[in-house]
Swiss-Prot record:
Residue runs in coiled coils: none
Protein name: PIH1 domain-containing protein 2
InterPro entries: PIH1/Kintoun_subfamily (IPR050734), PIH1_N (IPR012981), PIH1D1/2/3_CS-like (IPR041442)
UniProt superkingdom: Eukaryota
Family indicated by similarity: Belongs to the PIH1 family.
Source species: Xenopus tropicalis (Western clawed frog)
Length: 321
């Protein structure tokens, strides 16, 4: 299906982008410099190709027994975990058949591998995480024993890079829509900066609504998704957050207060928040996913949330039952 994003639309977006950049350069030179420098740095890091780190030698047991080489590499496109308590993001390439076995590329953030090489236990955990991910991704069974190959890379760097990038491009909608989304993202960021410059104030409350359903039914917490969507959601990092309990004079829980730092988010429209009596789910598509079991039952009908664009803080207030 061809994209409806035409050349005329793209030209209009570009003109709007330049207009807003000119306005920022004139009215807020410091913000303009920071904006340009950050995007140049991010662009440079994003374009850095994956670098081989070590190669693991093991075996595929099922469906067919064969040698497997796992090229573990470092790549800036893979984010670092938000904290030590958060899951480690991972990216995998495609299984490629060679004359003497099969090879697959696994990418971690450079800082993750740097720390792992200082601790043999942590490095072993990363290797086993990679093996488990490969088993689940490709529905195969691996031998749980392995050894580190005497070389860093099986195959060549070009094949490894292409394999990882093919996976990153899936699931693709179409190039036109992707370009449109990128342009809109930049425009939204510029609009947000301009808005913050004009007024440092909190945005209106997020409206949390529920469809007519029995009260025991959780809203939006169960959703049928494809296997690809499931993989993508599991890989999304959890944002920094802080959950506190306010109590009345008698010491009884009165409400739960959740603070969430959503860097890179500029509008409440990007957030999908669902709260039930005993848990909370926050999703920012393509950026963050946070699922919390609440320590106290809350009144889901009176939950309120506000997003402060100036500091990227989402504040959720949940009165207890």
């Amino acid at each position: 299906m061809e994209s409806s994003f035409t050349q005329k639309d793209m030209l209009a977006q570009v003109n709007q982008l330049w207009s807003m950049l000119d306005d920022m350069a004139e009215n807020s030179p410091e913000s303009y410099q920071k904006f340009i420098q950050r995007h140049m740095k991010e662009g440079k890091e994003f374009m850095t190709p994956p670098e081989p780190n070590l190669c693991i030698h093991t075996k595929i047991l099922e469906p067919d027994e064969k040698i497997l080489f796992i090229n573990i590499c470092q790549w800036n496109r893979v984010p670092a975990p938000m904290s030590e308590a958060h899951p480690v993001p991972i990216s995998a390439g495609q299984l490629e058949n060679l004359s003497d076995g099969t090879v697959v590329a696994i990418a971690y953030n450079p800082e993750v591998l740097k720390r792992a090489h200082q601790d043999h236990v942590e490095l072993d955990q990363l290797i086993r995480l990679a093996m488990k991910y490969i088993e689940e991704q490709y529905q195969i069974t691996l031998c749980h024993s392995y050894h580190v190959a005497p070389f860093q890379l099986k195959g060549n760097a070009k094949m490894m890079k292409e394999s990882l990038e093919r996976i990153q491009k899936q699931p693709a909608t179409n190039k036109g829509n992707s370009s449109c989304a990128t342009d809109n993202s930049l425009l939204e960021e510029l609009k947000s900066i301009a808005l913050i410059r004009e007024k440092q104030e909190t945005s209106p409350s997020i409206c949390i609504t529920r469809e007519d359903a029995p009260k025991s039914t959780k809203t939006k917490l169960i959703e049928e998704i494809s296997s690809t969507d499931l993989q993508n959601r599991d890989l999304l990092p959890s944002p920094w957050h802080e959950l506190s309990v306010t109590k009345d004079n008698a010491g009884h829980p009165q409400s739960l207060i959740l603070k969430v730092k959503l860097r890179g988010v500029h509008s409440v429209a990007e957030c999908d928040l669902s709260v039930s009596k005993d848990d909370l789910l926050l999703v920012v598509p393509g950026r963050y996913r946070l699922l919390l079991n609440l320590p106290q039952a809350v009144n889901e009908e009176t939950v309120a949330a506000k997003f402060n664009k100036a500091n990227y803080i989402l504040l959720v207030t949940m009165p207890t039952l």
